[in-house]
């Protein structure tokens, strides 16, 4: 129901739609032949800024109530972390064009403007109306067991930051 109701796609984000995904389940019984009396599951929801977070949380509560009526189960929902994204940096902001120019000049990279469905250090600046960008060279291993960072990438990123400082 949530994916259908909140189906807007925004090409600036990766993924381009809101997500409502179960990401962690805690152990509840010690043996395979025991039916658990309780279950504890965590969801990671990344909501596009177009939506009202409180409305989505209300919809989740309503879904839980419907399931309780249907099954007799008791469902308790607890929000462990909630963050409403601040207004995004304008794609034409000076810092955006400066970073794109630096990437083109120093690394021959044609950058595209985008966002992620999660928190970054830029959010703290955007909350106080400072346009901010986030960028780095990565191998797409974040939050995985084999997560790593290459020294070569860090050095190349430092060259971009140095170029930006020279232009400021």
Where are the predicted features?
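Metal-dependent amide/peptide-bond hydrolase catalytic core
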Residues: 1-168
